[in-house]
């Protein structure tokens, strides 16, 4: 039993602090998906391990055969596949075996921050996070400020800029006009002034 009032950690931290291959992979994911730290990587990696562990156990039981059609093992396998399909992590024709081939990237691609960037609501993955945190993004008309929210497949078309936000796709894609250079335009006149002064007749004393 945990301490009352204290939330339980939802992810497992690495067992060994100094593993170059793992550190390089985590750093690459942080940069690729614009994360603030590695906690999101560890959380999604923990979720993936649970999915794969459950799938592996169910495949072991189901491979033995002789299971009735209403067996809870079959229902559990169907529920895992259906859940991952609903999240858009697995394709519609996927099977339980496909869960074993999933990577952390597959879950990262379903984050709200990633989808906002992929759909062109932001010019960069970091800008997508900024828009979400500052309340410029809505899901089905409601403001959403959680970059790590896993977007359902059915919710992708419900994403938009929040009503009242000054940001639009037109403004985002518009290129700023180059600033005029009045000094450069005045340069020829300034250069011509000494020549005109030299050509002017001198007054007799």
Swiss-Prot record:
The keyword Nucleus does not apply. Residues 173-205 are annotated as: Disordered. GO terms for biological process: ribosomal small subunit biogenesis; translation. One of its GO terms (cellular component) is small ribosomal subunit. InterPro entries: Ribosomal_uS4 (IPR022801), Ribosomal_uS4_arc (IPR022802), Ribosomal_uS4_CS (IPR018079), Ribosomal_uS4_euk/arc (IPR005710), Ribosomal_uS4_N (IPR001912), S4_RNA-bd (IPR002942), S4_RNA-bd_sf (IPR036986). Transmembrane segments: none annotated. One of its GO terms (molecular function) is structural constituent of ribosome. Residues 110-172 form the S4 RNA-binding domain. CDD domains: S4 (cd00165). Signal peptide: none annotated. Residues 174-205 have a biased composition (Low complexity). The keyword Ribosomal protein applies. HAMAP family: Ribosomal_uS4_A. Part of the 30S ribosomal subunit. Contacts protein S5. The interaction surface between S4 and S5 is involved in control of translational fidelity. Belongs to the universal ribosomal protein uS4 family. This is Small ribosomal subunit protein uS4. It comes from Methanocella arvoryzae (strain DSM 22066 / NBRC 105507 / MRE50).
